[in-house]
Swiss-Prot record:
Family: Belongs to the immunoglobulin superfamily. TIM family.
Signal peptide as annotated in the record: 1-21
Keyword Glycoprotein carried by entry: yes
Protein name per Swiss-Prot or TrEMBL: Hepatitis A virus cellular receptor 1 homolog
Sugar-bearing residue positions: N206
Matches recorded under PANTHER family: HEPATITIS A VIRUS CELLULAR RECEPTOR 1 HOMOLOG
Pfam family, one: V-set
Organism name: Rattus norvegicus (Rat)
GO biological process per UniProt: phagocytosis, engulfment; positive regulation of mast cell activation; response to lipopolysaccharide; response to mycotoxin; response to nutrient; response to testosterone; response to wounding; response to xenobiotic stimulus
Tissue specificity remark: Expressed at a low level in normal kidney but are increased dramatically in postischemic kidney. Expressed in proliferating bromodeoxyuridine-positive and dedifferentiated vimentin-positive epithelial cells in regenerating proximal tubules.
Cellular compartments annotated: Cell membrane
Amino acid sequence: MVQLQVFISGLLLLLPGSVDSYEVVKGVVGHPVTIPCTYSTRGGITTTCWGRGQCPYSSCQNILIWTNGYQVTYRSSGRYNIKGRISEGDVSLTIENSVDSDSGLYCCRVEIPGWFNDQKMTFSLEVKPEIPTSPPTRPTTTRPTTTRPTTISTRSTHVPTSTRVSTSTPTPEQTQTHKPEITTFYAHETTAEVTETPSYTPADWNGTVTSSEEAWNNHTVRIPLRKPQRNPTKGFYVGMSVAALLLLLLASTVVVTRYIIIRKKMGSLSFVAFHVSKSRALQNAAIVHPRAEDNIYIIEDRSRGAE
């Protein structure tokens, strides 16, 4: 029994996991964003509320807007509005001039009469800043320039010099030699860097982002959209059905177990009663037999006295 209770408790804890699925809606800061929510009016027109956070068990928490099925009867701010036809079941929420703080969970609750009949849908809103754009720029390239080495050479010259002036025979001329000096300029190359400034256009949040590297060369990158999440109402009903089936199975198991235990107890009691009755019958038979023998002796004594 304890193991069954632990199993059922674990199952009930796992049930909310199937309900916590929600659809992601994206928006851009400064632009209006619409969170879709519709219901079928075949069963009648009913009230609807929008709130922040996950859908509670009843009503809406942090109510943003409320309708009576035909028009808006309450709104917490002028930025919240329902632009669809409310009487036809279109109760999509539009947030004007969205800001970054609008990101988070939103609950659309359509109140349908009956137990657990409300249509609850939870959405995750992601508001991101607009991506700035810049005009396309054409890359420029400068070819490297090369200079040839330049060599400057000087010829040696002999300059006659005399150390002193005298009347004597002049001494041999002294010469001064200049060695040539060679200066070489090595070639150097200058290369200009090529800069490319790709430009981006703002994403329209429908899965397409356009990127351009040149004014004449554009290509489009497709971003896959996230698959829509499963319907939380169906998950809730499936979880409740599984829980009800397990509870029914548990109840039937308890009833069968009690029936078997009671049958065993009744069988043991009948056996004890039969044993007791049998022992009492044997005791009664043993008591009656000596009394019969006493009666015989009394009759014989009386017959002898008569003689």
